[in-house]
Design a protein with these regions (language model features):
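Conserved active-site segment immediately N-terminal to the catalytic lysine
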Residues: 206, 220-231
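PLP-dependent enzyme catalytic core of the Aspartate aminotransferase-like
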Residues: 5, 28, 35, 354, ...
Length: 397
């Protein structure tokens, strides 16, 4: 090989040294030790879903194939896709005049796809900035379009992201293409508890619902478009759900490339290109799990209890733990808190890991702690976290 490389004038490149494996955590866990994953995403999945996927990994339903290796155009996968959509429709009570797509590119791709598809013939899009992800969306939306991305409200300027811009304060033009907002902000722990009501003469709502979809009841008919990355409350990363009102498809211009064009994806039954087959399959298993739990209605009850219990532990800590968010705007999905001391916060993150409470560090720009308590997080996980919080306070308070 060296002679061949020398003849071609190419040089050999030494491989970097292989580093010895170091376990991330310094405690050995047994199968009986409960592990609770508080990651903001990719996030916890129901154990029964993982075990079903495990049992079907090599042979899905007697086909002799794994879903990972199955043709996306096979009858078997088309059935998986069909049932995933139907189960999602049932869970969210999606009206017949809405289309459902399983796309790729994450929710971030929708920042531009919504503008490219829905602003044809319009001069303005209204954008509400309420936290980190809506801020990024606002920055991204205008990059591939000449339409004016108008800042309708800014929660950072109004409240330093400790409260949400009231809907009454949104500066909305009735002639705008749509109003974009993020209903739950994972970084700042903010959530609109009530869906904004804009009126029939106002632009349609386009909502990033990534971190709360299926966690509570919503009226899909209140929205023009709902989109959600799967990796928080649905399934593994790799697929993005888009729910779009049918009449809005008339805005999709043929000048938008097919891969970014909602109408092109719908006209091809979601098969314009190869969809994320395995994430769709896992998402379908999660939808069935949600149905077995009593649907979104039951999950809303459990999620409300989990959040209420955890916030009570923070508020009743005598100031040792702090949450700066206005109570009415507190997220039920992403609970942020801190001790007010960076060294103590880091110690909390380290020690909680040894107790099986994983990935509690706050977002990199925020610090502190963040407990993401999505649908698949059991109440027992929240109770285990609270128990550790009290023990930690006794030692260092």
């Amino acid at each position: 090989m060296a002679e061949i490389l020398a003849a071609t004038g190419l040089q050999t490149i030494e491989s970097p040294p292989v580093k010895a494996f170091r376990p991330i955590f310094n405690r050995v866990f047994t199968v009986d030790t409960p592990i609770y994953n508080f990651s903001a995403g990719p996030a916890v999945l129901p154990e029964s879903v993982l075990r079903t996927a495990q049992s079907e990994m090599f042979d899905y339903n007697g086909t002799g194939f794994s879903v990972m290796t199955m043709s996306h155009r096979s009858d078997v996968f088309m059935s998986i896709l069909y049932h995933a959509e139907q189960d999602l429709r049932q869970l969210l009570h999606i009206p017949d005049n809405y289309k459902v797509l399983f796309l790729q590119g994450g929710a971030s791709a929708q920042f531009n796809m919504t503008v490219m598809n829905l602003s044809n013939g319009f001069k303005r899009v209204d954008s509400v900035v309420s936290g980190n992800w809506s801020r990024i969306a606002h920055q991204e939306m205008g990059k591939l379009s000449d339409v004016d991305i108008h800042l309708a409200a800014h929660g950072g300027e109004m409240f330093d992201y400790t409260d949400l811009p009231p809907v009454a304060s949104w500066d909305i033009d009735p002639s705008s293409a749509f109003v974009h907002f993020v209903i739950n902000e994972t970084v700042h722990g903010l959530q609109y508890r009530e869906v904004p009501k804009l009126g029939a003469d106002m632009p349609p709502l386009v909502c990033d619902m990534s971190s709360e979809i299926l966690s509570r009841r919503v009226n899909v008919a209140d929205f023009g478009v709902i989109y959600a990355g799967a990796q928080k409350n649905i399934g593994p990363s790799g697929t993005t759900i888009v729910i779009i009102r049918e009449d809005l498809l008339d805005r999709c211009s043929s000048r938008v490339p097919d891969v970014w064009n909602y109408r092109s994806h719908i006209n091809r039954q979601g098969m314009y290109n190869t969809p994320a087959t395995y994430p769709i399959y896992i998402s379908g298993l999660v939808f069935r799990w949600l149905q077995s739990q009593g649907g979104v209605e039951h999950m809303e009850t459990i999620n409300t209890l989990k959040a209420k219990t955890l916030y009570a532990a923070i508020d009743n800590s005598g100031g040792f733990y702090r949450n700066r968010v206005a109570p009415a705007a507190r997220s039920r999905m992403n609970v942020i808190f801190s001790t007010g001391n960076q060294e103590l916060d880091e110690l909390f993150a380290q020690e909680s890991t040894t107790r099986g409470l994983r990935l509690l560090r706050g977002y990199k720009s925020m610090g502190g702690m963040r407990a993401s308590i999505y649908n698949a997080m059991p109440l027992q996980g929240v109770e285990a976290l609270i128990e550790f919080m009290r023990e930690f306070q006794k030692r260092y308070g």
